[in-house]
Amino acid sequence: MSLFEINNVRKSFGDLTVLHDISVKVDEGEVVAIIGPSGSGKSTLLRCATMLETMDSGELIYLDEKAAHNDPAGHTAYASPADLRRIKGYFGLVFQNFNLFPHFSVMRNLTEAPIHVQKRERGEVEKEARELIRKMGLEGKENYYPQQLSGGQQQRVAIARALAMNPKMLFFDEPTSALDPELTGEILKVIRQLAQEKMTMVIVTHEMGFARDVADRVIFMDGGYIVEEGRPEDVISNPSEERTKQFLARFSGQGAINE
């Protein structure tokens, strides 16, 4: 079953076109890794998919519900605000810089939106939040504030906060890029666990070994185009496109691919 589709999306900033007719479909339980150089359009695609950026043209579908479609003039028209609020509940987004509420404790970061946006019962929400805190290895940190936590701990809180909304799928935008190398592993471990639990995920990442081991499908982007797409053992370990080979050559010899 398809959970998410983005079809023929185009996006420009002024005279610069950053996405050229991009189409991606993600099935339930699938893990898709998006790789590519800086400026390739990876994060812009994620921001369009999560409606943080508007598309110039294209179609956006979650669970067969159209969040956006092309109007007769070929421009993107979005669903009503009420429909978009509901559709946005289908996914969670984890940023590279955590984006936690600095004046909220760990517990309140997790419970604020489920209680006040989803209007769920506080006792139920707090029970689920405590379980997520345990799952993320953050027991005893419930009343800590973000500035009292390491970067890796803050990112685990951000993942738990996204999961607290009970989304159907998660988007990750370079979840380890703001972390020291020794903290990267703990975040990748959490994402691996989510993959084993069949959480549907789209992950923009520069961790090639991780993408190879965890993703069901890898998309390589460059210059706002999808250059190559397929199984990780094909795209990462045996790419067919010359541009993909050039990009991945930067990682050879670092243990990133052949670890």
Residues of each region from the PLM?
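ABC ATPase "signature
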Residues: 229-230
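Helix-to-loop junction immediately C-terminal to a conserved catalytic motif
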Residues: 50
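Catalytic Walker B motif of ABC-type/P-loop ATPase nucleotide-binding domains
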Residues: 170-173
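Conserved ABC ATPase signature
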Residues: 145-149, 153
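Conserved ABC transporter NBD signature motif
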Residues: 58-73
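A short, proline-enriched helix->beta-strand linker immediately N-terminal to the Walker B motif
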Residues: 164-168
